[in-house]
Amino acid sequence: MKKGIHPENYRPVVFKDMSNDDVFITRSTINAKETIEIDGVTYPLVKVEISNTSHPFYTGKSKLVDTAGRVDKFMSRYGNRNKK
């Protein structure tokens, strides 16, 4: 690794999976606006939509994630077309 190009300000940060409310603490340099208290210690909080605890690849369960209505938008544009 090259010297002087990697961040040095790693600190414990809580990542919260919003799809199943799992939380895990890891070291990161990410800036967070929210905080959370766990076991009497306050940590920066980063909310994520999907993590290894809810991703179908890791869980083995299939799940449709449609956060922006993309499937509905596609179906309204192309779903009613007849096959030739």
UniProtKB/Swiss-Prot annotation:
Which InterPro entries does this entry report, sorted A to Z? Answer: Ribosomal_bL28/bL31-like_sf, Ribosomal_bL31, Ribosomal_bL31_B, Ribosomal_bL31_sf
* PROSITE patterns registered for this protein in UniProt: RIBOSOMAL_L31
| One of the GO BP terms on file | translation
Gene Ontology MF terms: structural constituent of ribosome
Can you name a GO cellular component term? ribosome
The alphabetical list of record keywords is: Ribonucleoprotein, Ribosomal protein
In terms of HAMAP family, this protein maps to:
Ribosomal_bL31_2
Q: How does it assemble?
A: Part of the 50S ribosomal subunit.
Q: Which family does it belong to?
A: Belongs to the bacterial ribosomal protein bL31 family. Type B subfamily.
Name of the protein: Large ribosomal subunit protein bL31B
